[in-house]
Amino acid sequence: MDRQFKRTLITTALPYANGPVHIGHLAGVYVPADIYARYLRLRGRDCLLIGGSDEHGVPIALKAKAEGCTPQEVVDRYHELIKRSFEGLGISFDIYSRTTSDIHRRTASEFFKTLYEKGEFVEQTSEQYYDEEAKQFLADRYIIGTCPHCSNDRAYGDQCEACGTSLNATDLIDPRSTISGSAPVLRETKHWYLPLDKHEPFLKEWILDGHKEWKSNVYGQCKSWLDMGLQPRAVSRDLDWGIPVPVEGAEGKVLYVWFDAPIGYISNTKELCPDSWETWWKSEDTRLVHFIGKDNIVFHCIVFPAMLRAEGSFILPDNVPANEFLNLEGDKISTSRNWAVWLHEYLEEFPGKQDVLRYVLTANAPETKDNDFTWRDFQARNNNELVAIFGNFVNRALVLTHKYFDGAVPPKGELTDYDSRTIEEFAAVKQALEHQLDTFHFREALKEAMNLARIGNKYLADTEPWKLAKTDMNRVATILNLSLQITANLAIAFEPFLPFSSAKLMSMLSTDCPFGWDRLGSTDLLPEGHVLGNPELLFEKLEDSVIDAQIQKLQDTKLANEKAAHQAAPIAEDIAFEDFLKLDIRVGTVLECEKVPKADKLLRFRIDDGLGGRTIVSGIAKHYAPEELVGKQVCFIANLPPRKLKGIESEGMILSAEDADGSLRVIMPAAEVAPGSQVK
């Protein structure tokens, strides 16, 4: 950061209020933004962290329609859930507001009117699908049809979620309205467009020449868009949910959500600072930083800056440290498939472990490429790093001090060369941390913070104060004094990353007033004689059973998705009725059932068929334990010729249905019948 700014305005992408937030949102946007804001505050810098819910647009209208309620009821419910979830994880917003607020409606309308009156829009007429039964134009998500690329017959007008291809509504084969189910027709409609091509020369110079320090993934995506050439982009659409376009002749039209949403950063700042918001948005000594995911790079690096420049009085973003995507157990996170770890559920199922999630998401952050979250890695990082390194060092330092010095910080005596080298090592952490945090390398910054705990662990292991206690208590005092100073330094270094654990550690150190960042690296944070609090476990080991339950939860979701997506096999060719009558299907009671030796798929049944009994061998051993079927009634074909399987003569075939996941389910009568009863 070459320029000297007086203040930093940090914004976070507005989460869509049609569902909860998940770990992908957190890793990509909210945890790194919170780390950065906490770091700046700790350094005494003037900064604001601005957030809020994005509450307009087609997905919310669709959600309301599906749930049989109003869009306002949908956003009211999810806005509160999202806000509580962020608070639970310690995301320290100065304000978390929403785009249905009165102040946002006014701000967005005024912004549009300013550009409209300056002649910054162009009007264009285009053809758009119209539902004649519902008497309304259809947004992309209100149209489904067959994808021309993969033949999925549930593709939307903007994207096929089966193959991931971006589409135009007119690309769909046999399009139909999701409102009425009827085939839509094309009609002309007028909209206002922001001519991005007009701003292209400025954007090329501003980004490609002026911001080469941006992350490579951000700079590269911007360059790709600029190299292709920018096109006008609609700022209005035909919809009944949103902020009405505030000009004559715009009945039934609202502001496009991509235009409306980023103005939420401005309106939320206005709401927080009604008298000073312009200082944050219009002063050249304010640094504006957008935290977003990679799907929002174009909007925040090209479109929103073009809007701000067209308005003429606002500052432009100085940096946009966008992250890539986080996957889950090797698969793309999907809200529609419920393939996610939802924050509100995590907070309920892992009480008091907010920092474990913050740690893992930061350590595994998708900063320059997509990354993967797995529950086994979550467990390993907790047990092997937070517990075994950080927590272990803190616990040993405090427990030994209580054991040998009644919990009071002992005096520091003469330092050895090893002591001095250790002090130099942990004093260097401050500069390393600052470099990584200032350049938005949060994953590397976390490694530097954890390195401080490693330094402490190594120091205790090498000096072995528990052995010296028998012969040299003065030396033990010096060792534990330095160990406690490292512990206090850990409370500072980890505050941006693990605020709950940092506060807990400060409490164990009996320090009410947090140390300032400027004291990081100091060896006199805790004065001689200062009485410590009682040591507690800073982190707890996660057992396999806890993680197994989460993995099973995902497996259940995967099975449910497979069943939902299952398509029945095509109907076989017609047969003559007489051929069907040849089958003698009967009901029998299972008397015995056992596995066939040296055959992992086969079970041997002894069946009461009402005619003296029979033996049947069936290939369902992978789907049932033998004892599950004893005493049950099953349907079987009785008039098949006997055949030998693994040396056993089988006298029939037990009927099963194959489920969507490939599992077999034996066909059983709904109520018990006499053995040998025929199925008709």
From Swiss-Prot:
Cofactor or coenzyme needed: Zn(2+)
Note accompanying the cofactor annotation: Binds 1 zinc ion per subunit.
Cellular compartments annotated: Cytoplasm
Organism expressing this protein natively: Porphyromonas gingivalis (strain ATCC 33277 / DSM 20709 / CIP 103683 / JCM 12257 / NCTC 11834 / 2561)
This protein's encoding gene: metG
Xref: InterPro entries: aa-tRNA-synth_I_CS, Anticodon_Met, Met-tRNA-synth_bsu_C, Met-tRNA_ligase_1, Met-tRNA_synth, Methionyl/Leucyl_tRNA_Synth, MetRS_core, MetRS_Zn
Residues annotated to bind Zn(2+): C147, C150, C160, C163
Known EC number: 6.1.1.10
Protein's UniProt name: Methionine--tRNA ligase
Reactions mediated catalytically: tRNA(Met) + L-methionine + ATP = L-methionyl-tRNA(Met) + AMP + diphosphate
Motif residue range(s): 'KMSKS' region: 332-336
UniProt record, GO biological process: methionyl-tRNA aminoacylation
